[in-house]
Amino acid sequence: ASDVYKRQGIGSRFGGGIKQLEKMGPNGEIIMDYSIYDAVEAGFDKVVFIIRKDIEADFKEIIGNRIGKQVEVDYVFQDINDIPEGFIVPEGRTKPWGTGQAVLCCKGVVKEPFLVINADDYYGRHAFQTIYDYLTTHEDDDKYRYTMVAYRLKNTVTDNGHVARGICGLNASNELVSVTERTRIEKRNNGIEYSEDDGQTWNEIDPDTLVSMNMWGFTRSILEEIKTGFPAFLEKGLKENPLKCEYFLPAVVSDLLAEDRAAVKVLESEDKWHGVTYKEDKPVVVEAIQSLKDSGLYPQHLWD
């Protein structure tokens, strides 16, 4: 059975506190509780949390300890100093090395196909089941066989500001061809529009466009690929933007696609995504989760 794991980033647009640990449910649940519940229901049997060492105690108190009673849990720590031999962390750099490095931290504890998700996104039951079913019925052959769950753009926007989304390009076999990052998408003029110049000009975009919410299914082969690509990334990044450059997971996938060494099956979810990009999003998410409980999808007390 496959592993699930989560990565923890710290949100810059959400004022104050660690937004991934913000309480959303009536009994102190956070978004992650629901994701883990859905993952376990789907068949996943292990959770790996990728966190910063300095939040370990808070993290265990808020969620880790109660999850540990339900499913096997591992912790790995993303550390800025954990880089390949021959490289030095630039003076003044405080930012870790991005989602690629985060996933690489799991190399020692992940032994089978696994799922990567954001800690602060609510993905919905269907997404976990679909990705579990794919991971347990496919393995690498002449290509790495990866997968991702995509959402309709209209199901992933907020009324409270702009969002960044990865727009998916697909081929006829529903495999990923490209992910184009659009960093400013918002609801405007009764539709959805994006801007590439900080809001000076806007372009319409189809609300049914498929977007990535960073829900990826991988075989262990990705871990070797991330490791192999890290030095080349640092070589370039440290010259161009030493304090801010990040080794992004989707960039590793894009390179493998460009070299025709991987195929990424795009699975669709019709579920509505929920997340807290802005403080004002919180009541909407709290209400959505309560109505899912009322409909019977979740018990009122998740882990009792």
Residue ranges and their predicted role:
Residues 67-113:
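Short phosphate-binding loop-to-helix
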Residues 112-122:
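Short beta-strand-to-loop acidic/aromatic patch adjacent to the donor-nucleotide binding site
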Residues 125-215, 220:
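Conserved core of the sugar-phosphate nucleotidyltransferase
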